[in-house]
Regions:
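N-terminal cationic and glycine-rich segments that engage phosphates or anionic surfaces
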Residues: 1-430
Length: 430
């Protein structure tokens, strides 16, 4: 990775792109330090820390801690991610959107992007309103009234919209995927906090603390190696193209492959599963923890669905597997792939074009997705199990964060390598 960046730095055009990307990240970090007025950040930080296993805790991790500090960029890229997922699902459910995405070409892509932007602003407005209501209900506001409410909500909506714009600028003038890189920077900003927590844990546990932290570091390194290998792993189905004559020229006849990535859906199944699985705990957090003596039944239910319970881990793991299959079928439709192969004169050796081909692709997809889903589940719940073993010690960076950081790093390096390769070909042709 460092070697690739050094080589890219030697190319003037790529150096400008890298500098531009770093400037955008600097602006993002400055925005993360600007507080929104009328909110007591100390009380808010204590409240968010108590909600570490809920949806609010997930938002805090994804924003790099800005959510708990009530900064202008507190909502971060979450509204954009949510709107992208919703539009993606609506594209499948609504035929008009499906046709626009499939047959609209460049104009269709721009229209979908425009719809996603409007949806981002709408979701940011709802989340900003929810943020304000939490602060109001838990007496976190320093001043209440219509004007403070407007200032807080507008600040969050404007901040989220500006973050979306920053990501789009990186897409156009920088390197890699802008939203992913901003998410990457936000998560990495939590590393000093994690180091501080590790130091506190060692101080409280003594020599045994050193042993646990050493094992934790080894586990994180092993997880990174696993993520790198699985992210790059793919199943390649051989494809043969029939020869065809157009005029006096003969086309086709070459062999190719149909790549099928093991982790096709990325980190989305984990985000969706965590949001849904932690909803009961989030509701209990708002209602209040039931008393064990006065409400034993309610307390038993609360203990069963708590984010540190065994039942939660099982439900969370199964949800990740379910969402992995759901997203895999969305992104890799066997029937559509089979039809495209048939139209272009391609076929899989040993299988007739049409239904037999689609059935074979679906069978392979199910096997590959199962492995990828189990991998995602293990990576997601491993930090929770480790935290439970360490006396409910809460990790500042979990499995979801590690997958995002490693995935974005690999994606950015690949983008740099492809741009360097493109410029080598350009120089040769010139």
């Amino acid at each position: 990775m460092i070697q690739t960046i050094r080589k890219a730095w030697g190319i003037p055009e790529l150096r400008r792109k890298l500098v531009f990307t770093m400037l955008i990240l600097l602006i993002f970090r400055i925005g993360n330090a600007i507080p929104v007025p009328y909110i007591n950040t100390e009380l808010l930080g204590n409240y968010i820390d108590s909600m570490s296993g809920t949806v609010l805790g997930l938002y805090n991790v994804m924003s790099g801690g800005a959510f708990a500090e009530a900064t202008v960029f507190a909502l971060g890229v979450q509204p954009y991610i949510n709107s992208s997922i919703i539009i993606q699902l609506l594209t499948i459910a609504i035929p008009a959107l499906e046709r626009l995405a499939r047959d609209g070409g460049e104009a269709g892509k721009k229209k979908i992007a425009s719809i996603t932007r409007y949806a981002t602003v709408a979701i940011a407005l709802l989340q900003g309103l929810g943020y304000y209501m939490i602060c109001k209900n838990y007496n976190i506001l320093e001043q209440s009234g219509i004007w403070p409410a407007l200032v807080i909500i507008v600040s969050f909506v404007a901040g989220s919209s500006f973050v979306m714009w920053l990501g789009e600028q990186v897409n156009e003038f920088g390197v890699g995927n802008g939203i992913s890189i901003i998410l990457f920077a936000g998560i990495l900003s939590r590393v000093p906090n994690m180091i501080s927590m590790c130091a506190s844990y060692i101080a409280s546990k003594g020599s045994i603390g050193y042993l646990w932290i050493a094992l934790l570091i080894v586990g994180i390194l092993a997880m990174i190696v696993l993520i790198v290998h699985v992210n790059e792993a793919e199943r390649r189905i051989p494809v043969q193209y029939a020869k065809r004559q157009v005029g006096r020229k003969m086309y086709g006849g070459q062999a190719s492959t149909l790549p099928m990535k093991v982790n096709m859906s990325g980190v989305l199944p984990i985000i969706f599963a965590q949001s849904i699985a932690s909803l009961p705990a989030t509701v209990w957090a708002f209602v209040g923890t039931p008393d064990k003596d006065t409400s034993p039944v309610a307390y038993s239910i609360y203990s069963a669905i708590d984010t540190k319970s065994v039942l939660y881990l099982i439900v969370y793991f199964l949800m990740i597997i379910g969402f992995s299959y759901f997203y895999a079928t969305i992104q890799f439709n066997p029937v559509e792939i089979s039809n495209n192969l048939k139209k272009n004169g391609g076929f899989i050796p040993g299988f007739r074009p049409g239904q037999p081909t689609s059935q074979f692709i679906a069978k392979v997809l199910n096997k590959v997705t199962l492995f990828g889903a189990i991998y995602l589940g293990i990576v997601a719940i491993a930090p929770l199990i480790v935290g439970k073993a360490l006396d409910n010690y809460s990790l500042a960076i979990g499995g979801t964060s590690v997958i995002i950081v490693v995935g974005v790093a690999l994606e950015t390096v690949q983008a740099l390598e492809s741009q360097m390769l493109m410029r080598q070909y350009k120089g040769f042709l010139e």
